Amino acid sequence: YIRRVRQGSIYSLLVESQQWCKLTLTLLLLLALLTRCTLSETLCGSELVDTLQFVCDDRGFFFVPQHVPPRRGAHRRSRARKGIVEECCFKGCSLRLLEMYCARPSKAERDVARPRQRPHRASQHSRRGSQSRGRGRSR
């Protein structure tokens, strides 16, 4: 009888601990989802500058947006006048908003219509020509 009571209490402890583990795991997953779904984060000072440097890379950035999405009301107009500090430090900003403050690439970097010359191929063509000329002379 004593063994049955001990076994029963151990069993109930195991069941309770498994339930706690499931509950804890569920709460952790929910917390992870909620933090991942956060759309904006406040960034100030050097943290804001470092983030802009990372997002904008070689293009550089401005503290006032250079290109603003199409305006559809007062909310968009007020956003156009604000700088990045007001947006990101006081309210919080998203990656999309940060990208609005990046400088545009130079015209040469944007122009994909003009073909780029490849000197490597040109040197291969000149070698082929000299090889074929050389063969013709030796015959």
Curated annotation (Swiss-Prot):
Residues 108-139 are annotated as: Disordered. GO terms for biological process: positive regulation of activated T cell proliferation; positive regulation of cell division; positive regulation of insulin receptor signaling pathway; positive regulation of MAPK cascade; positive regulation of transcription by RNA polymerase II; positive regulation of vascular endothelial cell proliferation; regulation of muscle cell differentiation. InterPro entries: Insulin-like, Insulin-like_growth_factor, Insulin-like_sf, Insulin_CS, Insulin_family. Residues 104-113 are annotated as: D. GO terms for cellular component: extracellular space. It is found in: Secreted. Its main location: secreted. Keywords: Growth factor, Mitogen, Secreted, Signal. GO terms for molecular function: growth factor activity; hormone activity; insulin-like growth factor receptor binding; protein serine/threonine kinase activator activity. Residues 115-139 have a biased composition (Basic residues). Residues 68-82 are annotated as: C. Residues 83-103 are annotated as: A. Residues 1-38 form the signal peptide. Residues 39-67 are annotated as: B. It comes from the Eukaryota. Residues 114-139 are annotated as: E. Belongs to the insulin family. The insulin-like growth factors, isolated from plasma, are structurally and functionally related to insulin but have a much higher growth-promoting activity. This is Insulin-like growth factor.
